[in-house]
């Protein structure tokens, strides 16, 4: 308890003018230098503040977040909490160092610093994934993989949990009312309609890039689901430069990443001859 109270009441480090003692004119080598430290801010209240932020951060995970601004707000709070945790760690480390109690907590601080480095590296990797996907979604969602396709109008990036042999993309049919609330859905994630789908999609991960080719479509009348069209993609084992595709007119060609989407809008009449 005494050790806890001594840490809880530590203050901020304020450097005072230093002085040199025991220095005689005849001896310029042997001297004692002292740098007084003054506590001016209670360290304990800062710990309480960070603890409250951590509780708020954990409580926010219980609330379902669906809108992008809610996800952005949550990630912003999480980022601020991580910065405050890093500040408190360095701040308390300096205080314990000044109080001569660093040795008792050296291993704990080493572990905290390692975790902070891992968190920072993860943030850098998510930024790199954003660059690969041309989207901010990797910073908003915690998924390991993202299904991406790019059109002239929009860069689609939908979170995906694992690598599978088949990807099923659910879309509103564009003709029947009422339409689906979200136009493109994969699993529990969705993306609003901005442009059409393409012959292929790509799964991006930290060290993963897997291409999937459109194999078939299933309409609402085939599945019994209302107002929905299902685009089924299968994993490719061929080289990317020699991927054969099937277009609306039945001709085959080579996948061109810059090509226009073959579906301007998913409709009940959309089909792909195989």
Curated annotation (Swiss-Prot):
Superkingdom, natural source: Viruses
Keyword field: Apoptosis, Glycoprotein, Host cell membrane, Host cytoplasm, Host Golgi apparatus, Host membrane, Ion channel, Ion transport, Membrane, Secreted, Transmembrane, Transmembrane helix, Transport, Viral ion channel, Virion
The keyword Transmembrane helix appears for this protein: yes
Residue spans, topological domain Extracellular: 1-34, 100-104
Cytoplasmic topological domain: 56-78, 126-274
Residues in CoV 3a-like viroporin CD domain copies: 145-237
Segments passing through the bilayer: 35-55, 79-99, 105-125
Post-translational modifications reported in the UniProt record: Exists in both O-glycosylated and non-glycosylated forms. The glycosylated form is associated with the virion.
One GO cellular component term: membrane
All copies of domain CoV 3a-like viroporin TM, residue ranges: 33-141
Topology class, membrane: Multi-pass membrane protein
UniProt GO molecular function: monoatomic ion channel activity
Extra information: Bat coronavirus 279/2005 is highly similar to SARS-CoV (SARS-like).
Task of the protein: Forms homotetrameric potassium sensitive ion channels (viroporin) and may modulate virus release. Up-regulates expression of fibrinogen subunits FGA, FGB and FGG in host lung epithelial cells. Induces apoptosis in cell culture. Down-regulates the type 1 interferon receptor by inducing serine phosphorylation within the IFN alpha-receptor subunit 1 (IFNAR1) degradation motif and increasing IFNAR1 ubiquitination.
Protein name in the entry: Protein 3
